[in-house]
Amino acid sequence: MNNNAFHFPVLLDAICKLIEDLPVKSDLIYIDSTLGEGVHAKAILEKYDFLSLVGIERDPQILERARQFLSIFEERITYFNDWFDNFFVNYPLNVKANFILVDLGISMFHYKGSKKGFSFLEDEPLDMRLCSSSCKISAAEIVNTYSKYDLEALIYDLSNEHYSRRISKAIVEYRKIKKIETTKELQSIISKVYPFSKVKINPATKTFQALRIYVNDELARLKRSLPFWVENLAKDGILAIITFHSIEDRIVKDFFRSLSCDLYAKISKKPIMPSFDEIKKNKPSRSAKLRVVKKL
């Protein structure tokens, strides 16, 4: 197996600063709720030998990549192959985490190496399921069976795509002739009805985002997990969440705002953003926002 990661750790310097500010630095528990290939975890474990990691990852394919990538830290890591919203259901009440990291961005491996149709850069089967055994429906099933009105609502609600009506109509018209099976087919359908003058990003970007979020139930999982994350922090423990689009960022922002100021404190009023230099080195980081809360 290739032991190189596809992904770059976003906002790593800011995350390390949070760990360095922890008042105690001995036998601490670090939970990575979205382990992915383990790029944040590797950088953190290399730098801080007082941390033990619990790594949570739903996709068994990418979890195996993480195991290989993090093999030198094997004695300090416990792996959990499931969705992060399931992890705390049986979590022991007397074991609290000192640092919880949540990176809500999709891994570059899923875009570039999984062959599951997360990206339109290659022609792949239109699937988008992080785990085929627990996700009930694929992206292909959605675009081939949902009504025009349901598609329009799904695309708009989960991506704020202003041309969701045009796109849903084009999808329904196309599938009358041929079943939509691949990423390039769907991208082509969308591109043909998108106003050329309005193109700042690839016309298919937001629709692909909406389908991925829906297929993997991402927003509901986030909402279910937020209370678990803060409740399972130790005193002075930190919850750090990286978001990549406005919908999930609003969910995190509103939840943090709802927390009792007697129990929790926001580290900064505004989200922490990547620097110009980081964006230059890692273009996908440009959308990242880091929000942080501390248990008092």
Curated annotation (Swiss-Prot):
One of its GO terms (molecular function) is rRNA (cytosine-N4-)-methyltransferase activity. Disulfide bonds: none annotated. It is found in: Cytoplasm. It catalyses: cytidine(1402) in 16S rRNA + S-adenosyl-L-methionine = N(4)-methylcytidine(1402) in 16S rRNA + S-adenosyl-L-homocysteine + H(+). Gene3D superfamilies: Putative methyltransferase TM0872, insert domain, Vaccinia Virus protein VP39. It is an enzyme of class 2 (transferase). The keyword Methyltransferase applies. This is Ribosomal RNA small subunit methyltransferase H. It comes from Borreliella burgdorferi (strain ATCC 35210 / DSM 4680 / CIP 102532 / B31) (Borrelia burgdorferi).
